[in-house]
Amino acid sequence: MKQLTRKKIIIGISLFLIAIVVTLVIYFLTRGESYDEEVPIVKFPFKNLFDENKKPLNIILISAPFREIEHEKLYSKYKNQGLAFCGISSYLEFPGHIDNPHEDRFHEERKHDYTKMVSAWLHCFRQEKIPQNLKDSGMPLLLMTEADLKWVDDTPLPPMQKEYDFIYCCLEDNSKCDPGWQSYIRNWDLAKKCLEVMCSQFHLKGILVGRTNCEFTDKCNGIVKVTPFLPYNEFQTEMKKCKFLFVPNISDASPRVITEAICYNMPVLVNYNIVGGWHNVISGVTGEFFTNETDIIPQLTKITTNYNSYQPRSWFQANRGAKISGKILADFLKQNYPDLNNKEVQYATVTI
């Protein structure tokens, strides 16, 4: 009788444990499927990830340093909701030390360690320039920028008459043209030296967006048009009138303008030391690199004499974009986020 009672107890406990296991399995399997309904649409410095059906994934990107206590509270709120986090280098040298002397230092005062807030990181750096805190983190890293995910279709571009040789964007910082945040990241000091070469030696016509209150070489008088800040659509229209894009920037993580120019089939002339976007500059195909006002000369010669041989748009269509880079990103997320709410995602994109 005692043995029978003991068997009943054992069977009862076993059934109870099995029920708990089954309940937990069902919970974890179904939790991810319905999670997309709960994912908030976030704002800077956070960004959303979306699947190919434009449904938000349950991974929130941290794209820049926090600016205020409210950002800290939002991080805690999203974390408590069960959302996962991934870092992305979309802002200056983030998550490394930000060199721009005009940058907000709230994150340093609060001693934020963003590499400990996330499970993986999408970065933009050359291998030798990866910040030490990213190297030391041991987390999975992927070379991927937001601009790599730009949607570009196979539709040929309609022919457009080129009115200018180049375009360069450096927005105003203040009314006196004193050094500021914009002039630092757009490398205005180097740009002025290069503009003198471009105008005096090559007689190139160009558009300079943003520096309406700044003086630079008179060699460009009459051949370089200076405009104030342009709304996005107007800027795109002006850019399409130019043959190539000039980018002397260094402290720039993911210049969307580089990808936009490439997709307009414009070669790009880019500072070799730029933080991000360098991986889309392929010599003789999408553009050329330079570092100063001296070594820009042979690169200008190359672009201006071989302009029609560059095929930047075709290269981007074959190597980047939502369906190619987006698939790489989706595979990276599936590999490193086991609780991803869409385990069948084909490609992922980021809010830009």
PLM regions with names:
Residues 63-180:
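Catalytic core of nucleotide-activated saccharide and alditol-phosphate transferases
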Residues 149-222:
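Conserved catalytic-core segment of nucleotide-activated headgroup transferases in glycan assembly
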Residues 236, 255-263, 278-279:
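Short alpha-helical segment that forms part of, or immediately flanks, the ligand-binding pocket
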Residues 243, 265-266:
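A short alpha->beta transition loop at the rim of the catalytic pocket in nucleotide-sugar-dependent
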Residues 250:
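Aromatic "clamp/platform" in nucleotide-sugar-dependent glycosyltransferases that forms part
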Residues 267-271:
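Short hydrophobic beta-strand element within catalytic cores of glycosyltransferases
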Residues 272-284, 288-289:
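Short acidic/histidine- and often glycine-rich active-site loop of Leloir-type glycosyltransferases
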Residues 291, 304-352:
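A charged, aromatic-enriched C-terminal amphipathic alpha-helix characteristic of glycosyltransferases
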